[in-house]
Amino acid sequence: MKALFLGGLVACGAPEPEPVDPAIELGTGDIDFEPLADGGDVYVIHGPQGGYHVLASLRVVGIETGNPDDPADAINPTMTFSVEHSGVDITLTGQYHQGLDPIVPEGGDWSHQTVGRLCILDIPDDDVLAGEPIHFAVEIADTNGVVLTDTRDLIAVPHPLN
């Protein structure tokens, strides 16, 4: 009788989670995700190799998030960060093909994230953007064909340690 009962539990399994609508949020931060609000400031950072970048982060729910332990895994999504100034794309590089990390502890509106990616800018000096409005954007495409985008209109501020 015990074997029959245990077999019934295994056959039933856990209920499937309810599907959620795919969503994305663009943010910043180098260790933890930091949300951005339209009209807010974002730091332009002078990197160790002489260039300038904005720290780019995102969090998502409802998409294939890939394998965060294997950057070469074909199931990983592709994310593209970009910055426009005066209608011109000033992004030198900002594309990543990698798995997203689960958000721990679980709960809230988001399931996975990536934090602190570099959106490298094609600018000669941070003075070019000091106090200027920029359009910061992200697009993520998963292997199931789901594409999500988010944008923020921000004010560029040179990092105080530049």
Give the positions of each predicted feature.
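Sec-dependent signal peptide recognition
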Residues: M1-G7
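Short beta-strand elements
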Residues: V146-N162
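Short, compositionally biased P/S/T/A/G/V-rich stretches that sit at domain boundaries
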Residues: P17-V54, H159-N162
